Swiss-Prot record:
Acts as a transcriptional repressor. The C2H2 domain is necessary for the transcriptional repression. SMART domains: KRAB, ZnF_C2H2. InterPro entries: aKRAB, Ikaros_C2H2-ZF, KRAB, KRAB_dom_sf, Znf_C2H2_sf, Znf_C2H2_type. It comes from the Eukaryota. This is Zinc finger protein 425. The keyword DNA-binding applies. Residues 9-80 form the KRAB domain. PROSITE patterns: KRAB, ZINC_FINGER_C2H2_1, ZINC_FINGER_C2H2_2.
Length: 752
């Protein structure tokens, strides 16, 4: 048997040299990899059993010095049977092309990777790319067949520079290449595609590739802690080298894997092949079903270390952690705005592009997100999937339910940094912040009136334009405000009222009737810790506790006045808007509150539904009955701190305090005269107008005050309601009784 052909290889055939300029460009990990690969190549040649001297390259590396090649490095001419190539043919460093030699030793260039021309041919290539990179040799010996005839590799003479970092000096030393090695060519060799290292045994190549995988894991940290990190990394590297061969015929989107294309096509077909066995909800992907099942099982395996909040998915926890860190990794390329979530940036990009691909089939309105379209469609279907567990009220949006629940819990998470006042809604805090700076950002273009809220300004503008955008669905009548429409619809709702079976009281809504039925039950589970009073609902207890604490959380954005209850603030805001939606059908007088209209209607009907159980006297107003009952009991709970005088009603005490303070808030517009009591101003205005609204039905005489008319009627009837306790004498007027009592007071000292 003939001996196999051999090829002569030197160490420089598998070595790589850098200039000083190139060495500084390399990163630290690249320098380490370079040194490791050079040592490995040397050890591979040494392991073949041939004796040769250790190259200076390896010696300097062991001494910790950098190996640099000078600019004057050159290649020796090739010793072959044919004519050697010229210097012009070898000097390819500025061409950026590949330098190759064919069988006859003739050099030639190629734009692409070198390939073998046949089983008996071998190209030895040197990749010399770019003007800056002066890599003089990067060759790998490649073995093809046993019949390969003997060739000689380029014998090189290179000028090497040894650079010692400590001494900072350069020493130029011309070096001859070490002796050649006769390496027999095997039947097949295996080359590493990363570093071009050659192996004769395949398992050695596989073992060698693991070292690259470890180094790659350091470069790609997201694969480092995964149990399948290495396999995923190899798969990722393989995909990066491939093309996206699998294209969707519907949207022309391309994928690396056929399975990814099949998964994507489910979006176009609308298939949801994975149903949930618990709630019959269907999903496109099995992974989404698995995540959904965690909700039924109550599993939340991913917990936040900062606040303890748990999540179903790892990605949800990752997004949540950005709240604590403040990280916003997704930046808009148009305006440099940053976002915490990628989907937030995608929605933002539609503002730049103006694209709104999701259209409502009912009204034609467009949206940038599919979720926003689904939420909008609930307004057409009147679907309200989010209901309150306390009062049963339903909402279209989840965020509205969250805001409503704070009414029951009393939670106020938004605090003002200036005055530490807390608010239930974030928009209320924003409006409150404008009060500190005195800014009313929304101004009416007609009258320049300022508003804290845009909605308040729009409602105000309808007064100028006489626009009435709120029509009644029953009769078609239009209104400027939704509150006026709501009051009007009550006229139609009287035919659709829900009566209470216990007290025959009727309600316009079923939910109101449900709440009212709790009145007839004796259960009151919510008790006040201060006074022990019990309530049927937690919300009522929350409102009651504000009486003890003096808290007034609802502030009017117009005048800064505060209220304990939201309903009181809403009624107060109607005064600013000059809104009086409740009108009397008899005299066309309007009122802010429904209760005011109800009390007014009793003037026309003469109804007095409140009767005193002591004297059977009847009253038109419930407040008047309460004040009257205090006269029977002799109780006067409202006392003046100045003089100790007591009153049966709060407003009487308020009027009395003005006597001490000298305050006269009610001023006549005609003569600038001021009064402590509003009723006194009304009587005074009758003098200017000459009107006497209270007339006697017997003689037609008119009076300014109602009590004057009552006293006058006693003259016709002969009644003397005011009697003296001392002598029993009776009088028509209370003033006459007081004068008479003074007479008795003067007589008592004289008798002594």
């Amino acid at each position: 048997m003939a001996e196999p052909a051999s090829v002569t290889v030197t160490f420089d055939d598998v070595a790589l040299y850098f200039s000083e300029q190139e060495w500084e460009i390399l990163e630290k990990w690249q320098k380490q990899m370079y040194k490791q690969e050079m040592k490995t190549n040397y050890e591979t040649l040494d392991s073949l059993g041939y004796a040769f001297s250790k190259p200076d390259l390896i010696t300097w590396m062991e001494q910790g010095r950098m190996l640099l090649i000078s600019e004057q490095g050159c290649l020796d001419k090739t010793r072959r049977t044919t004519s050697p190539p010229t210097d012009e043919q070898l000097n390819m460093k500025n061409t950026g092309k590949l330098l190759c030699f064919d069988d006859e030793g003739t050099p030639r260039t190629k734009e692409e990777d070198c390939r073998l021309n046949g089983p008996q041919k071998q190209d030895l290539c040197a990749a010399l790319r770019g003007k800056e990179r002066k890599i003089l040799l990067a060759q790998t010996a490649t073995f093809q067949s046993p019949s390969l005839r003997e060739t000689e590799i380029l014998n090189k003479k290179v000028s090497i520079t040894a650079y010692d970092p400590d001494k900072k000096d350069l020493r130029h030393k011309p070096r001859e290449t070490p002796g050649r090695l006769e390496i027999p060519t095997g039947p097949r060799c295996y080359s590493c595609y990363v570093c071009r290292k050659v192996f004769q045994v395949r398992r050695d190549l596989l073992k060698h590739k693991r070292s690259h995988s470890k180094s790659q894991l350091c470069r790609y940290p997201k694969y480092k802690n995964s149990s399948r990190g290495k396999s995923e990394l190899r798969r990722t590297q393989r995909l990066l080298c491939q093309k996206k061969r699998f294209q969707c015929s519907e949207c022309e989107k391309s994928y690396f894997l056929k399975g990814s294309l099949v998964t994507h096509q489910v979006v176009h077909t609308g298939q949801r092949p994975y149903p949930c066995p618990e709630c019959d909800k269907t999903f496109r992907y099995r992974a989404n079903l698995k995540k959904h099942l965690c909700l039924h099982r109550g599993e939340r395996p991913f917990c936040c270390g900062e606040c303890g909040r748990a999540f179903v998915q790892q990605c949800e926890l990752t997004e949540h952690l950005r709240l604590h860190s403040g990280e916003k990794p997704f930046q808009c390329p148009q305006c440099d705005r940053c976002f915490r979530l990628k989907r937030g940036m995608k929605v933002h990009l539609t503002q730049h592009s103006g694209k709104r691909p999701f259209h409502c089939p009912e009204c034609g309105r467009s949206f940038s997100r599919k979720a926003a379209l689904k939420t909008h469609q609930r307004t057409h279907s009147e679907e309200k999937p989010f209901s309150c567990g306390e009062c049963g009220r339903k909402f279209i949006y989840k965020i509205k339910l969250d805001e409503h629940i704070r009414v029951h819990t009393g939670e106020k998470p938004f605090s003002c940094p200036e005055c530490n006042k807390s608010f239930r809604l974030k928009r209320s805090l924003k409006a409150h912040g404008l009060q500190h700076i005195g800014k009313r950002p929304f101004q009416c273009p007609e009258c320049s009136r300022g508003f804290f809220w845009r909605n308040a300004m729009r409602a105000h503008q309808r007064l100028h334009s006489e626009q009435k955008p709120f029509p009644c669905a029953e009769c078609g009548k239009r209104f400027t405000r939704p509150s006026k429409l709501a009051c009007h619809t009550r006229v139609h709702d009287r035919q659709k009222e829900f009566p209470c079976g216990e007290c025959k009281k009727t309600f316009s809504q079923q939910s109101r009737l449900t709440q009212h039925l709790k009145v007839h039950t004796t259960e009151k589970p919510f008790s006040c810790a201060e006074c022990g009073r019990s309530f049927r609902r937690r919300a009522h207890l929350t409102e009651h506790t504000r009486l003890h604490s003096g808290e007034e959380p609802f502030q009017c954005p117009e005048c800064d006045k505060s209220f304990s209850w939201k309903a009181s603030m809403k009624f107060h805001q109607r005064m600013h808007r000059d809104e009086k939606p409740f009108a009397c059908g008899e005299c066309d007088k309007t009122y802010t509150h429904q209760s005011q209209l109800t009390e007014h209607l009793r003037l026309h009907s003469g109804e007095k539904p409140y009767q005193c159980p002591e004297c059977e006297k009847t009253f038109r107003l419930k407040g008047n009955l309460k004040s009257h009952l205090l006269q029977h009991s002799g109780q006067k709970p409202f006392s003046c701190v100045m003089c100790g005088k007591s009153f049966t009603q709060q407003y009487r005490l308020t009027e009395h305090i003005r006597v001490h303070s000298g305050e006269k808030p009610f001023q006549c517009p005609e003569c600038d005269k001021s009064y402590c009591i509003r009723g006194s101003l009304k009587v005074h205005l009758y003098k200017h107008s000459g009107e006497r609204p209270f007339q006697c039905p017997e003689c037609g005489k008119g009076f300014l005050q109602k009590r004057s008319l009552k006293a006058h009627l006693c003259l016709h009837s002969g009644e003397r309601p005011f009697s003296c306790d001392e002598c029993g004498r009776s009088f028509t007027y209370v003033g006459a009784l007081k004068t008479h009592i003074a007479v008795h007071a003067k007589e008592k000292p004289s008798s002594l």
